[in-house]
Amino acid sequence: MLLFCYCLLLGTRIGTRIGTRIFIVHPIISPLIAVETAKKKKHIKWRFLDYSLLKNPLYVTVHGSHRSEVERARKRIKYITCTRREFLPRVPISFYQRFFSVFCRNYPSFLL
């Protein structure tokens, strides 16, 4: 229950998705997210993106030529950090997936 309230207060939606979509974040928190931008086959480039100016929640997409590349990239995305305030503790994403995605997967976007 405490984790659910914590999630509601933060307005954070995190959950694994089918295919190359990794997780959803709410831009109010202004996170810096490590995103794979693979331009070439078997070559992975990483960059940090600031989504603070966006108005809607968004899908962070990992681009890869093959499903195995996507799976490798999913394992490499490990941390979510915040730019303005440390709303989220610096813990592995798997922690959030385990505890928050259950509550947030079907969370109505109008409440965010």
From Swiss-Prot:
Other remarks on record? Partially overlaps YMR086W.
Indicate what this protein is called per its UniProt record. Putative uncharacterized protein YMR086C-A
